[in-house]
Design a protein with these regions (language model features):
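Bacterial N-terminal signal peptides that target proteins for export
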Residues: 1-6
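N-terminal signal peptide c-region/cleavage motif recognized by signal peptidases
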Residues: 14-15
Length: 394
């Protein structure tokens, strides 16, 4: 024990003498994992998001560019409904619908995705109303339609043939009008940014109906609308189970609607997160990830050296898992560190102020989250006593 205490002292004044950062050696920073969340609040062990470059006016670096103004991008990414070359044409760097030639389909199949497209109602359609002006649509997976149409309507009292609300621009066609009409006049470019999540099925039944969110010219117009059926005219058509990836389509409704700057980003289903979500977590998956994290953290601990670093390390391990081996290591490390702290002079205690306060906070996180009891480790009482003494001397 004497040699161990001497080793602790050496480590304290060498490796641990520098001031800790906000996290420093203290792994326990926020409330602990639970049955539906494999990670703690503010968990530094949680995987860090991949960096995506977002140059101004250009697609993000992880986007699949479907049309960039070139014939090459058409040849590589688009076909007709039968898989043959699309009859839509490139004109002045725009992807233009050839009326009555049929839909343009992506060659690749996509499921849940973020989709960006810019489109324009031809100027000659400015005085057309109802479903007659610049009619097209974005059709995610070839099943659901976000309407494209000349729907600019600055004068609600004008005596014109009005359209049905669930068929104007940015409507989920035949289901839901946009929250507001964010349309621009014919001849002015418009943008759609669509976030699409497909329905989830199990054993032939819909578990979750799927949602679509639409920003029209930067304005939120569809707020996670739950899909009620397929995109059809005049009749209700219930949701139908389909493949999880299918080509997306641009509609040919007989108007030469031009498009530009089309890109798509594949995104995970919100139901794919089975390890950290109140909505979709599976307890067995959460448990497995917590055990994996605990094992990786435990491998970094030297159970023979009861210093602040290893004590805080084992406390963090316990926040993920309370395997017998981890509990035994915690008892041993805490007892050794407790003995070492009690051997310190007042000057040495003051030199370890940061580690005393930080380790005490770690214990309190575990106690607050009912991972351990308040009296399970005598070390906590020692830390609390020393911390009070140090605060009195301030």
């Amino acid at each position: 024990m004497k040699q161990t205490l001497l080793a602790c002292a050496a480590l304290s004044y060498a490796a641990l003498s520098c001031a800790a950062s906000e996290r420093g050696i203290f792994g326990l920073y926020g409330d602990t994992p639970d049955a539906k969340h494999a990670w703690a609040i503010h968990d530094f062990n949680r995987p860090y998001p991949k960096q995506v470059e977002t140059p101004e006016g250009k697609p993000p670096s992880d986007a699949i560019v479907l049309f960039d103004g070139t014939q090459k991008s058409i040849d590589e990414n688009w076909c007709d409904a039968k898989g043959q070359p699309t009859k839509w044409r490139v004109k002045d760097g725009l992807f233009v619908c050839t009326p009555r030639s049929g839909v343009a389909c992506t060659k690749r199949a996509f499921g849940d995705a973020q989709f960006h497209v810019e489109w324009l109602s031809p100027l000659e359609d400015a005085k057309k109303h109802g479903q007659l002006g610049g009619n097209s649509g974005v059709i995610p997976m070839g099943m659901y339609e976000i309407q494209i149409l000349n729907s600019y309507d600055p004068d609600p009292n004008a005596k014109v043939e009005r359209n049905y609300p669930d068929g104007i621009a940015a409507s989920v066609y035949a289901q839901n009008p946009p929250l507001v009409n964010a349309s621009r006049p014919a001849g002015v470019w418009q943008t759609y940014d669509i976030i699409f999540h497909q329905p989830i099925w199990k054993d032939g039944k819909v578990l979750h109906p799927g949602t679509v969110t639409v920003f029209h010219n930067g304005v939120l117009v569809q707020d996670a609308w739950e899909l009620e059926g397929m995109g059809t005219h005049r009749v209700k058509r219930p949701l139908v189970q389909h493949a999880t990836k299918l080509p997306w389509r641009l509609q040919d409704h007989g108007d030469p609607v031009p498009f530009r700057n089309i890109w798509i980003r594949e995104i995970p289903s919100r139901w794919d997160n089975t390890t950290h979500s109140e909505m979709s977590a599976k307890e067995e998956d959460v448990r497995a990830l917590r055990e994996k994290t605990a094992s990786a953290l435990f491998a970094k601990i030297d159970v023979k050296v009861p210093d602040a670093k290893n004590v805080n390390g084992i406390l963090e391990v316990l926040s993920y898992s309370k395997k017998p081996a981890y509990l035994a290591a915690a008892q041993s490390l805490c007892a050794g560190y407790d003995a070492w702290l009690k051997s310190l002079s007042s000057k040495d205690v003051a030199a370890n102020r940061t580690y005393i306060a930080g380790t005490l906070k770690g214990f309190d996180v575990l106690i607050r989250n009912k991972v351990i009891g308040a009296d399970d480790y005598p070390l906590r009482a020692t830390l609390e006593q020393l911390n009070k003494q140090l605060n009195k001397k301030k």
